[in-house]
Amino acid sequence: VPDPTVHTTRHTVDVNAPVDAVYPIIADVTRWPYTFAPTVHVDLLDRDDDGPQQRERLRLWATANGVVRSWISRRTLTPAEGRITFRQEVSAAPVASMGGEWLLEQLDGGTRVVLLHDYSVVDDDPDAAAWVARAVEHNSTAELAALRAAAESADDGTLLSFADEVYVAAPAPEVYDFLYHADRWRERLPHVARVELTEDEPGVQILEMDTVAPDDSVHTTRSVRVCFPTDRIVYKQTVLPPLLAAHTGTWTLRPERDGVVATSHHTVVLRPDRVGALLGDSATLADARDLVRRSLGTNSRRTLEQARRHLQPVAD
């Protein structure tokens, strides 16, 4: 059997920020879902610090040509060299193998980032090779543009994280079931005007819904949800309200007393260029932060409070 064809790609971008500002964005996988558009979620499975190098094992969920894929990768980080190598341990068809490298070079006043990939496809199928080539091209270009934007706008106040929690006197599986079955939210949640839910792969959902905000405006959102029975659901919005550049979230359930503390976590990146047009010429980024915190927090609390009413009707 001949060796499979190995395809290679090289993508570069120059960033107007020092290596010390760029490298941590690539190194910290918890930042990827709200930084890189294709990345839905990353779980850090294992980490080993070994002197000048760190080794990690990750499971990633990401979109490729509009389809959600998941795989396990190993990474070796060498900060002193501005280098991060990666190799998929378990790939998702039609990818048979994939690896690569991030290389960062300090320039006068900035950083050159090089992203290398090498990959093969199942059975050397030419249609599969073309599909993977499109995905690598699209995702690499998008990730480098997002990396540049994130590094050049660091600490500008556009990143916002917050959480709301509600105690529910019900078993965790029942609360999880309420959050998991978003297809029933139209009947259960007054702030949801329309909902469509698909789950072609167990535990990976596509959720589209129209949500009524506190000011009675209606926003259409589309999210990829990754479900971990029976204590966690993570999601990333792929169709966003106009004020947001990114929005990720997590529903978590923590046992307490005879029930659970249900928490809704949000991380958003605001679009400062839209603030004036959407909120008025005198509106500030602080106004936008307050509005987003209030709107998302209100809807999250409504969802959790409705779960509480649904699951413990006698208490209410």
What are the roles of these predicted feature ranges?
Residues V1-Q53, A133, T141-E201:
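Hydrophobic ligand-binding cavity/cleft-lining segments
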Residues P4, E56-N65, S70-I72, R87-T141, ...:
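Beta-strand/loop substructures that line and gate deep hydrophobic ligand-binding cavities in soluble
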Residues V15, H117-Y119, V168, T211, ...:
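Hydrophobic beta-strand positions in extracellular immunoglobulin-like domains
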Residues T12-D14, T76, L103, E165-Y167, ...:
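Generic structural detector for well-ordered beta-strands
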Residues S161-A163, T220, T248:
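Transmembrane beta-barrel architecture of outer membranes
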Residues P2-P4, T30-Y34, D43-P94, D183-E187, ...:
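Glycine-rich portal/gate segments that line the openings of hydrophobic small-molecule binding cavities
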Residues V136-L144, R148, L296-S300, L304:
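N-terminal membrane-insertion helices
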Residues T35, D43-D48, V114-L116, P126-A130, ...:
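Short, tandemly repeated low-complexity microdomains enriched for cysteine and small residues
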